[in-house]
UniProtKB/Swiss-Prot annotation:
Catalytic reaction equation(s): Mo-molybdopterin + GTP + H(+) = Mo-molybdopterin guanine dinucleotide + diphosphate
Protein's gene: mobA
Keyword Magnesium belongs to the record: yes
Protein's UniProt name: Molybdenum cofactor guanylyltransferase
InterPro entries: MobA-like_NTP_Trfase (IPR025877), Molybde_CF_guanTrfase (IPR013482), Nucleotide-diphossugar_trans (IPR029044)
Keyword Transmembrane helix: no
Length: 198
């Protein structure tokens, strides 16, 4: 059951990319430390929500084992993570949508709780992690009431989550440059380098 001390949130795991850096392989299903990457994220976030959403454009039946709902965006050309965020916002059942990439298995519960606790301070604005001054929009917490504004930006042709969220008054959780919890294991080399790390 979700922690009642934290604001109720839906959680979206983004697994919809082409996997170009992985030679076209579906990143979320690649194994790391004996489990698919998506399984590590599922194990971490499952206690935080009763509305776990996975956005993917292929292998939906396999991802269904790790989600309450599987969604896909409405384009066939892999238009990027904002498409998955739109799909998640469209079905989210709670006032907040916590967005995470499927290829970041080193993120920890403490950091997610910090992000969720921040929501109570400014409930109308999105929150993002900012690592060494660099915004990380795929580690974000978005009020679902902003879905219409995000949809408007999409219709105007904006495909960048950062460009869309910043004008909505995004707040930052500051992290030091190189924080290993945000490591995206999105190439074979990175996957190998982090394979033995706990």
């Amino acid at each position: 059951m979700p922690d009642s001390a934290l604001p109720p949130c839906s959680i979206l795991l983004l697994a919809g990319g082409r996997g170009q850096r992985m030679g076209g392989r579906d990143k979320g299903l690649i194994e790391w430390q004996g489990l698919p990457l998506i399984a590590h994220l599922h194990r971490l976030v499952r206690p935080l929500t009763d509305d776990l959403i996975v956005s993917c454009n292929r292998n939906q039946e396999r991802y269904a084992a790790y989600a309450d709902r599987v969604v896909s965006d409405d384009s066939r050309d892999f238009p990027g993570p904002l498409a998955g965020i739109r799909a998640g916002l469209a079905v989210a059942r709670h006032p907040w949508l916590l967005v995470l990439p499927c290829d970041a298995p080193r993120i920890d519960r403490a950091l997610l709780e910090t992000l969720l606790q921040a929501a109570g301070r400014t409930p109308a604005r999105p929150w993002m992690l900012r690592c060494g001054g660099q915004w990380e929009p795929l580690f974000s917490l978005i009020p679902t009431h902003l879905a219409e504004e995000i949809e408007h930006a999409w219709r105007q042709g904006d495909r960048s989550p950062r460009h869309v969220l910043l004008p909505l008054g995004a707040e930052a959780i500051e992290l030091a440059a190189g924080d290993p919890r945000l490591a995206n294991l999105n190439t074979p080399e990175l996957l190998a380098n982090h394979r033995e790390l706990k």
